Amino acid sequence: MLPTYRGLGGLYNGATDDGVPIEVALSGPTLQRQPALCWKYLAEIGRACLRAEPNAGHFAIAEWQRQRPGTWLLTQNIDGFHRRAGSPPERLIEIHGELAPLSCMACGEVDRRPLASLLDEPLPPRCEVCAGVLRPAVVLFEEMLPERALARLQEQSRIGFDAVLVVGTTASFGYILEPIWRARQSGGLVVEVNLQPTDISPLANLSLQGRAADVLSHLLRHISSD
């Protein structure tokens, strides 16, 4: 099971083994100045993703999207599991990017080698063309969101939301809170699924505590039968 980013058992709850906050280690400036340090923790995330598989929650969301063509998925996850589970790419917004493939920070070459093989080599991984440092297409701390993903989110926000299902996030960023506020302002339904209460809980019409893999398949099956 992959750890959450914040909250109970979260990856970003403390300092790293190197004595710096994870937000510093996994930042754009650190990747530029100390690529080996940044890649130490990128590799930990990468290896955890490679060991894991999409769970029942991912498949339940994908099935719901197939049944309801107007349903969009906004995810902060960078593991690519929603694609693997079958969520339609045209209605999937990966706002923080995806771990693979890597590209060269110097020449821009896209590296198609498997991520697993690159993580087995000395870090940071290097470009086969120019020996520059490779990086994933993910949003590190202190970096801008990808323009295309942000534009798609803004377009859907302008259209509005009848209902928002918030799963496994503390919604620490304004762009994650935006759909929740939009739904609330228009009288829409907000349902939260999380291991523990969060700052979102007072905004939700219904808060369900539990693992997404356990809750989502039952919840969406119940909604589908109505």
Predicted regions and their residues:
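Conserved catalytic core of sirtuin-type NAD+-dependent deacylases
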Residues: 1-226
